Amino acid sequence: MSLLTEVETYVLSIVPSGPLKAEIAQRLEDVFAGKNTDLEALMEWLKTRPILSPLTKGILGFVFTLTVPSERGLQRRRFVQNALNGNGDPNNMDRAVKLYRKLKREITFHGAKEIALSYSAGALASCMGLIYNRMGAVTTEVAFGLVCATCEQIADSQHRSHRQMVTTTNPLIRHENRMVLASTTAKAMEQMAGSSEQAAEAMEVASQARQMVQAMRAIGTHPSSSAGLKDDLLENLQAYQKRMGVQMQRFK
């Protein structure tokens, strides 16, 4: 796996799924391929994206700044600086300075990532902030190692949180989660179906499923009523899958 592929993988792992994730992936690919060289426009685009947390925007801004060639005097962006200040916690800043001194002696991506993984996400973000604000300089490889370590820490906590939700025994949370998944699946199928004539059946099934979820939420239903909702939806679309050759199993 190449260095840039690895960076792209780690960065995308902390971006929520959805159309915006596909857009960001495309931007990263363009930047890494040298196709997008307007850092100013890129940062303006990033700043106005919805859904993304300030920290995710800060990390993406840091990656874009590292990768896109720019004039020396180009001003640093406030939204990135604010995201990479370690929540203003002096402890994070102290640890970030110690980490920076270690990284300065490092020259490889994997070496930097290994060192950085023993620090908290707050300290890692602060260290990125030091480099972003030109208070310290490390090689691009080392900076990317720092980025990937930060993303790994964030993705780990997201995974723990997700696992807790999936394994929860609370029937209300499980009920809502099943309805959200069914609704999301229906939406994705509507998007994939597009405007072809054969897609009418799939669109109809997906639309009915979404209406059903809305009705269940509006009137309040027993937590067990959503059991198998998404699977039923997928089974109804098997005929469409065979005709269109679309791999609907991926949604399971």
Swiss-Prot record:
Gene Ontology CC terms, in alphabetical order: host cell nucleus; membrane; virion membrane
Domain of life: Viruses
Main location: virion
Membrane topology, as annotated: Peripheral membrane protein
GO biological process, one term: viral budding from plasma membrane
Region annotated Membrane-binding, chain positions: 1-164
Keyword Membrane part of the UniProt annotation: yes
Cell compartments where the protein resides: Virion membrane; Host nucleus
Gene3D superfamilies, alphabetized: 1.10.10.180, 1.20.91.10
SUPFAM superfamilies: Influenza virus matrix protein M1
GO MF entry, a single one: RNA binding
Record keywords: Host nucleus, Membrane, RNA-binding, Viral matrix protein, Virion
Annotated spans, RNP-binding: 165-252
Sequence motif: Nuclear localization signal, positions: 101-105
Other facts: Most abundant protein in virion. When expressed alone can form virus-like particles in transfected cells.
Assembly description: Homodimer and homomultimer. Interacts with NEP. Binds ribonucleocapsid by both interacting with genomic RNA and NP protein. May interact with HA and NA. Cannot bind NP without genomic RNA.
Similarity section: Belongs to the influenza viruses Matrix protein M1 family.
HAMAP family found in the cross-reference section: INFV_M1
Protein name: Matrix protein 1
Species the sequence originates in: Influenza A virus (strain A/Hong Kong/1/1968 H3N2)
Name of the encoding gene: M
